From Swiss-Prot:
UniProt entry tagged with the keyword ATP-binding: no
Molecular function terms from GO: zinc ion binding
Gene induction: Coexpressed with the other cluster genes on brefeldin A production optimized medium.
Entry similarity comment: Belongs to the GLI C2H2-type zinc-finger protein family.
Organism in which the protein naturally occurs: Eupenicillium brefeldianum (Penicillium brefeldianum)
Protein name (Swiss-Prot/TrEMBL): Probable C2H2-type zinc-finger transcription factor orf8
Upper taxonomic lineage: Eukaryota, Fungi, Dikarya, Ascomycota, Pezizomycotina
UniProtKB keywords: Metal-binding, Nucleus, Transcription, Transcription regulation, Zinc, Zinc-finger
Tree of life domain: Eukaryota
Amino acid sequence: MSGSSEPYSDEPSQHNTHRFIDQIPDYPWDDYSGPPLQQSRGYSSQDLSPLQTYYSSGLSVGLNGQTGGSESGGSQSGGSDYSYSQNVPASLLPPAFYLVRSDSYPGTGIESRLPNSYLLSYPPSPTDPNTYYMPETSQFLPSHDLSLSVQDSSEILDSLFPQQESPSVTSNDEFLVQILSSRPRPQCWDHGCNGREFSSMSNLLRHQRERAGAVTKAECPVCGAVFTRTTARNIHVFERCEGIGRSL
């Protein structure tokens, strides 16, 4: 043994540290589901792409490349309390992508790893008639979910404002006939009339004037027939008088 010996140290040498870092495999982010990588493995926040940073730290990337508030990676995917808090430069961002609910595209077979079932999706073509883009919420909603048929809208209006059936015209007429028939008709109880009924009060008054002799009687100029009303005398003269018929 030589007399010179190196002092023993508990700390690993720099060479051993580099060997340890080189042995760490590069896990693809698509298959990685564990807690976010820590700084002790040799990965810095600048080495991560914006998409990887989103998966690891839970940052929501907006339309203009700005990042929202950072969330704890351990609270979302594992038991680690380590979290990233950083700003992603706009130059490192891929083409604009948006947060879309996974249930908006059923049957795709994609299982989201993001909280609240959110997926990263590229915007569809502006000419696509099956989707509507809403910049306020950055979500795409199918057009059939927003459409409402005329039949459905009419049913909703009928349920909110029920229509009241108005009584028919025939029922009103029948009701008026019943009222008129229930009214007592005027009658004459003079000698010889014995309660004769009249359709109106004016007819009863005229009958009483005729019986009292207050009305001048009208005579036919041809045959001399006497009439209590001039209307009846005129009809008799022009249509029924036998003297006119014989003279013609």
